[in-house]
Each structure stands twice: as structure tokens, then as C-alpha cells.
Swiss-Prot record:
GO biological process: aspartyl-tRNA aminoacylation
Job description of the protein: Aspartyl-tRNA synthetase with relaxed tRNA specificity since it is able to aspartylate not only its cognate tRNA(Asp) but also tRNA(Asn). Reaction proceeds in two steps: L-aspartate is first activated by ATP to form Asp-AMP and then transferred to the acceptor end of tRNA(Asp/Asn).
Gene3D superfamilies: Bira Bifunctional Protein, Domain 2, GAD-like domain, Nucleic acid-binding proteins
Residues involved in ATP binding: 221-223, 488, 540-543
HAMAP family recorded: Asp_tRNA_synth_type1 (MF_00044)
Gene designation per UniProt: aspS
Protein name, UniProt field: Aspartate--tRNA(Asp/Asn) ligase
Catalytic activity field: tRNA(Asx) + L-aspartate + ATP = L-aspartyl-tRNA(Asx) + AMP + diphosphate
Residues holding L-aspartate: 175, 221, 454, 495
Subcellular location: Cytoplasm
Amino acid sequence: MHRYRSHTCAALRKTDVGSNVRLSGWVHRVRDHGGILFIDLRDHYGITQIVADPDSPAFKVAETVRGEWVIRVDGEVKARADDAVNTNLPTGEVEIFATEIEVLSPAKELPLPVFGEPDYPEDIRLKYRFLDLRRETLHKNIMSRTKIIAAMRRRMTEIGFNEFSTPILTASSPEGARDFLVPSRIHPGKFYALPQAPQQYKQLLMVAGFDRYFQIAPCFRDEDPRADRLPGEFYQLDLEMSFVTQEEVWETMEPVMRGIFEEFAEGKPVTKVFRRIAYDDAIRTYGSDKPDLRNPIEMQAVTDHFAGSGFKVFANMIANDAKVEVWAIPAKTGGSRAFCDRMNSWAQSEGQPGLGYIFWRKEGDKLEGAGPIAKNIGEERTEAIRKQMGLEDGDACFFVAGLPSKFYKFAGDARTRAGEELNLVDRDRFELAWIIDFPFYEWDEDNKKIDFAHNPFSLPQGGMDALENMDPLEIKAYQYDLVCNGFEIASGSIRNQLPEVMVKAFEKVGLSQQDVEERFGGLYRAFQYGAPPHGGMAAGIDRVIMLLVGAKNLREISLFPMNQQALDLLMGAPSEVSPAQLRDLHVRLAPVQKS
């Protein structure tokens, strides 16, 4: 017999009754029933019940074992009595009568339990992550992660993509975040960088003629902590294709992403055909470029109904600035003063002066609008708003006014808040859509200059003609995101593969041809030797998994994550290094300036 086991703790069934077996695993719990000891033995695969009665030669050792000790058990498989069958376990019809127990490794008293869903501080859980990972939910999440990534690989290979690994030590390049830098010992004063993404390498693979590339790519960004991203590193399904339009990228990847969701959604409906929503429409309709389309609320502009009206706050704003707009946020079933007051209080807690509203109710046979706004704009305008928004008795509508670029995020948050409070959001489905036609440039208010809105390597719609003749802030990019349930889960673009167009695009943000050659020399040179039209995307694996398993944050689907302060509490990173190591790297530490 094998030294440690003949079966796993999930393998035994009623057909094994009478067999002598050997199992090894962790003591999940021990129960004493009238002098008979029952041990739930757990391994990676499942749980089997072990029985040790006082007549068993294993009983003496069984009395000593405690939770999370690692033991080996020899014994005979017996059928449980009918009233003792555990239908919650695959092994629930049998139990092992122990003849020998060997303690392979005792365990100290645990700093946190490894069963159930303990409400322990996250830093304790991360410090003892090897224990936390024994919990059933977290263990299951990690195994789901493995299966989802394997399915991604399988699906990409099936449609003709080749997996290539790109370098981890590379050159620093500005891609929207700080680089993690690695000092070179061999080249004093110079640094490598960990890749924020394999962007340039995958484009170089297209120039090299490989046609279809993908990899499960680690990406490293030295960003301030964010709720929707793990500090330090994350993984993406990275891909690139030659001789494609953006339509062909969508047509290729939509079945892959839909298939992944359908395979792991556990029966929840998944969008069959992904909608394509222009960025400008997404902002105006949902107040977000990653809208949760499970929320049926769609905003509309109602500026004309307030122009010249008796509601002077809005009317004066409209009269004084032609760019001012009023947006309406319809709230089906929200037509109670209590709900409207709650929304108004929430808006004030968000730093807003308030949130104007109208709600409709039947007065006899007549449907009337109520609230200060309805009173000020009059019955005719109130009715026109109701008809435009498709509202009825018991419904409400909220209003925001000003410059859309200033208020759209708040309007989107109000839409989300109303949808959640009124239970309008169907949480048991996955709603996916493409957001397309992103702006190529944006105004950087901090530095008072034009900057790239997204990927600087994207192709501007209209090419060189647009760059030379259009207002930069009006230029759109062949840039697209895939969104699901309020999260951006993928982003991509058709690339700018002509060197002269690339240089012109960077000139608009203040970089010269020399700057381009210095910062992106490899890519710039490659484009001068025959570069095919190409494009691709990258899907955030961590976010996809988080959505599919229903985890509340990204740390619940990652093996050994850092905490929100970018500290690895298990391994003690980042840590100080010895003076000798610093000398080898030609690095001298400057005193930390106290703020």
C-alpha cells in the first residue's frame, strides 16, 4: 500500500464497503459521542468520516489529535446506518473504522479558524494566508480560478491563437502608471522595469509575422491602492491579431468571452449578443463608461423643459451658459416622498447641494406631479417630462444640471443608487456589452495640456487627416472596452502601425519624434520595416473570476495577495536589504523626507 494513501478523502463510496484503505489529511474536527471518537478527515478533494471506538488499536492516538493536525489513517470502510447518512458529502454513506492512526504533523493553536466564514481582520487572514486558503469557500475560489484560466487557454488555442511568453524584465515606458523599477548590477545607474502590460512586445510579434498571439500575462503597476485592483500585480488574457478591423476583433473574442461566462456562470443567464454602445452615448445614458446594464434606468436630457421655466436655479444656469444641460434620472416605483428625501440626503452626503425630484401620484382621476420642482415649472412642463421619460403613477424622476463633463459621474452614481435601492437590478445574470468610439485625447486639467485618453498606441479614427485638421478633443479612437455588470473586464484597440502617424499623435501631447524614438524605439523602428494592420485586447482575469465566483473583492480569488497598503504580510515584503546588496546594485538610499 502507498505510504500515505490509497484513496483521497472524496473517493470512497458504498461500493467500497469492506475494503481496507489508507487516507491522509487534516483533522477538520473531532467529536466525542459517548466515548466513540468521530474525526472528519479533510484533504484537497473532500471529507471522510473516521470512527475510533475504545476497542480500536487506533483509539489511544485518536484521543490526542486536535484540529488541523495532519494524520494518516488505516481502516476498514463500513456503511453508515440509514439515520447517520450525510447527504451533504459525496462520502456521506460510508465511514472508516480506524485500525491505525499516525500523526504526521501536529499543529499549534490556530490564530484563526479554517472552516465557515470567519469575520476576522483581513490583515490576520493575509498574514496566515496558508491557513485562510484551507477554508472551503476560498479553496473553491482558487480552484475555480485554475479552471477558468485553463478554459481561456483551451478556447484561444481552439481558434488558432499561439501562446507566447514575453519578457518580464524590460524597459520603462509611460503607460498610465508608475513602473516597478529593477536596478541593474551590470549596468550601474540603469534600470529595468517590470511590464505594465506586454503591449509593445505583442505588437512586435505581429510585425514579426506570428499573426495570432495570446498569453496569460502578469502585469505590474506601482499604483496607489484601489478597491477594484490588486496592489502590485494582476493577470490578463492578453491577445493580438494581424490584418483585422475592430469588428473582426469583436467577432473573434465575443464567442470566447461569452463561452467562458456560460461555462462557469452556474446557470445564470449570459448576454447572447453583446450590445455596442458608443462612449458618448454610455456617458449620457448611464453616466459611466462601464455601465451596469442590469439596471434598467436610462437617463435623458430634458434641458428644454427647464429653459425659461419657473425653476430659476436651472433656468438661470441654462440662460447663462449654452453648454449647460439638465439630465433626468427616471426611477420606476420610486414615487414616495420618503424615497425621494433619502436620495436627496444621499446626494448631500456626496458633497452635492441636493437632488431635485418630481414624483407622480393619482389625485382622483388625474395624474399629478409633486415636489418643489413640479410646483415651479408648472403642470404642462411636468407632464411633458413624464411623457418623455415614460413614467406613471408611483414613479419618480431626479434631476442634475450643469456642465455634463462635471456632473456625469455623480449622475451615474445616482442612477446606480436608485436602481439598487428600488431593487431594479437583476443580480442573477451577466450583462456584457462593448463600449466603443472612445475619445483619443483628453484635457489634463492638472497639467493644462492635451493627453492621451487611453492607450497611446491606438489608431485615431481618420488617421493623419484627423490629426492634422480636427480639434484633438473631437478625435475618436479605434478603442473599445468590454464591460460586465458595472466592471470593465477587457480593453483593446486597433493599433497605430504607421510611424509618421504615430509621431504626429505623440506630437499632440508634447512629445517630439526624438522622444518617441527614445521611449518606444523598438516599436518605432519595427514599424519602418513592414508592419501589418493589427489590433487586440486584454481581459482582466482577476475581475472576470471575481464576477463568476461572486467574490466580494479581488483578494478572495487570489492566492497570496498584498493588503490595501501594498504590504505582503505573509512574506514580509517590501523589506530592507543589506548594505552589501545595495553596493552591488550601485544604489545609495537617500534619507526619507518627513512631511
